[in-house]
Amino acid sequence: CVVTFEDELMELNKKYFTGRALDNRMGGFMIAEVVKRLSENKKKLDFGLYVVNSVQEEIGLRGAQMIAERISPDVAIVTDVTHDTNSPMYDKKKSGDIKAGSGPALTFGPAVQNNLLDLLIKTADKKKIKYQLMAASRFTGTDTDAFAYSNEGVASALISLPLKYMHTTVETVSYTHLRAHETSL
């Protein structure tokens, strides 16, 4: 006998969304919203833009590796989620102090190109978008790693949406974060 829960995306207090499998789906949703805004505003870009969503990030970045090899980008801005460390059982000394509702998290780390990160920070400051900074001492654990080390190296950056209760059926994200994330992109 197999028992499953019937679930759906729910809104909490008009501030948060909660549901299952928001990890990675939120990144895909955000980039889809960016494309929608570009289309609605009839925005013409001075460069080619590939908007992709990958598979198998949790088990080895396989989709991102294939995409990076196929399109050979000059720049990659990856959207994903990160742990809200204000949830129970997080050691902020190890994981940093990242909180849902306080802005998207921009990551420093070996896979992140400093000039691209500086551009994201300056853009957020100019547009008065709140953000948080986090560090990755080795791997980011996201598709950023696949892009950064592909081909001959790709300038990469990571914008993460803080998510409570990752890898559970009640993953929770801030609605205002989601909109700020889209605006920064």
Could you tell me what each predicted segment is?
Residues 9, 52-60, 81-83, 138, ...:
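Acidic, glycine-rich active-site loops and adjacent beta-strand->loop/helix elements
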Residues 1-29:
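Catalytic-core environment of secreted peptidases
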Residues 138-158:
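Short glycine-rich, acidic/polar surface loops and turns
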Residues 59-132:
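Metal-dependent peptidase/peptidase-like ectodomains
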Residues 18-58:
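Alpha-helical metal-binding/catalytic segments enriched in His/Glu/Asp
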Residues 41-49, 128-137, 185:
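Flexible, glycine/charged-enriched surface loops at secondary-structure junctions
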Residues 176-183:
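Conserved small/polar residues in nucleotide/adenosyl-binding loops
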